[in-house]
């Protein structure tokens, strides 16, 4: 993992979700820990893109993925509750409040960005829709960018266009596998937002309390996996 595009001191966290969420690692600037966790996830999930891939897995490979996803399926008859996953991730950030997020909360928290990876196909009844979750994050000045993680053949589906509309209408960037944009571009944009926020807060601090301001960017990566596992007995 190449951390050259991320300024040292910026904190990163990872939350995964299906019907419920699990924190893989909380906000941290321990990049050794982050690298270890992401490498482990990459090894477990590599090449798993369809039910056919799952059917071809060995029992050991299947168990590795089941272990990694443990804690994300604790509600019956519900999967992929995307809005709930976004809110759970946002709750990792200082100052975020469930239900009634406001600018008072935003003033107490650090600049933050969430990267949401999903195909936006919901099964079940979530507590928060994606739009409701984005309303809450926007109120507390958390930017949410979207990475469409479904198949290319579904990029024109209504669920995909709905996700694009929701993300972009709340100030985020929406990327698909085939739109020509890259993760590096997204990271650069996040860094640009961080630099602008630092500059603005510095100007404010020079007026209100010279020399006393501090700021760090919290970048949250949400990786969402559709769990269609069939237990092998």
Where are the regions that the model predicts?
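Sec-exported extracytoplasmic/periplasmic mature domains
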Residues: 1-8, 39-46, 90-98, 138-139, ...
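Membrane-embedded segments
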Residues: 1-62, 71
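A mature extracytoplasmic/lumenal domain signature
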Residues: 16-18, 29, 40, 118, ...
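Switch/connector loops and helix/strand junctions flanking conserved nucleotide-binding motifs
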Residues: 22-25, 155-156, 184
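VWA/integrin I-like adhesion module and closely mimicked acidic/polar interface patches used
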Residues: 73-80, 84-92, 96-113, 117-165, ...
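Juxtamembrane amphipathic/hinge helix adjacent to a transmembrane helix
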Residues: 166-210
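C-terminal signal-anchor/stop-transfer transmembrane helix together with its immediate cytosolic
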Residues: 196-233
